[in-house]
């Protein structure tokens, strides 16, 4: 029998979301959507399944990180591991003749293979919400994205967060003097914040010192910017970074500059950033000015920048609210006798024009009906008589809500 096998469980890395969890997620998405739209962003929905080549973004994403399959014609396909590549592909083809800049937002699930041990991978499904701004370069576009991110974090109710801000172009300029072989080792140490490796690894001394120098470029803008000014980096990029920090601080965004911030995706070309709360990443993103040309039939270039929020992490960090306990249903309509069913249906239809209403469908006693309403956090019961008259009684909630969101019998 099927119930005797493991087939009834989702695969490792995937899970069911029960009604109350879905309700919290939908409320979070609605809060984010409201902020996205206030900035002029429009929703885009791209396929979950894309040609593998599209998803790899010119080699920026490792093939083994993508869940792959083959269609009936032998074409290699993949489940999207992130949204940016698919959205830029759509922008460079379907939206190429439209007005710029493009302001697009998304909500949806992504899939990745994560390495567990050498040669072993596990698949994971998780959710992302985010935006892409395509066709606008410069520090002012960077500022819009970061201020939008700040407004999103505020809208969902988190206050004690920090923006870690780096710039790939500045970090790359410091690494340019390092040989390619040593550069790979230094990058790995920087990405893992591994001071011990940098001190002990058999590296040229110049490469070691540059790696340690980059790891040391982390702190408040007023501390890091003067240090950067003494190094061989672009004065224009440094000026833009200073202006960006000033704008963010004027909006009460807590900024930590971090030149060791190297995102795992290789398509970033300018600023990169993470929003963190208590050491947990709740959002990340950056500028990708060379990605558009990979998908443009005419090989046209357009700058781009975006971020993704991590709803699963946000929901874990956000405290429960009274709204989380309610099903959303405002009233339960109960025909007391069969002759009252037509009137009960009419009442439910009328009230549903403005609110959520349930109809009692089972042959239960008044005590069982009240217990059901309590478990589901339905505030009122309308008891309908045979002649169509009714009375409404409030429901009290002495017991805690069912955490599964399921209102059936225990």
UniProtKB/Swiss-Prot annotation:
InterPro entries: aa-tRNA-synth_II (IPR006195), aa-tRNA-synth_II/BPL/LPL (IPR045864), HisRS-like_core (IPR041715), HisRS/HisZ (IPR004516), HisZ (IPR004517)
Pathway participation: Amino-acid biosynthesis; L-histidine biosynthesis; L-histidine from 5-phospho-alpha-D-ribose 1-diphosphate: step 1/9
Main location class: cytoplasm
Alphabetized SUPFAM superfamilies for the sequence: Class II aaRS and biotin synthetases
One Pfam family linked to the record: tRNA-synt_His
GO MF annotation, one: histidine-tRNA ligase activity
Protein keywords: Amino-acid biosynthesis, Cytoplasm, Histidine biosynthesis
PROSITE patterns tied to this protein: AA_TRNA_LIGASE_II (PS50862)
GO terms for biological process, alphabetical: histidyl-tRNA aminoacylation; L-histidine biosynthetic process
Compartments (UniProt record): Cytoplasm
Protein's UniProt keywords contain Signal: no
Summary of subunit composition and partner proteins: Heteromultimer composed of HisG and HisZ subunits.
Remaining remarks: This function is generally fulfilled by the C-terminal part of HisG, which is missing in some bacteria such as this one.
Function as written in the Swiss-Prot or TrEMBL entry: Required for the first step of histidine biosynthesis. May allow the feedback regulation of ATP phosphoribosyltransferase activity by histidine.
Name listed for the protein in its UniProt record: ATP phosphoribosyltransferase regulatory subunit
Organism for this UniProt entry: Synechococcus sp. (strain JA-3-3Ab) (Cyanobacteria bacterium Yellowstone A-Prime)
Gene name per UniProt: hisZ
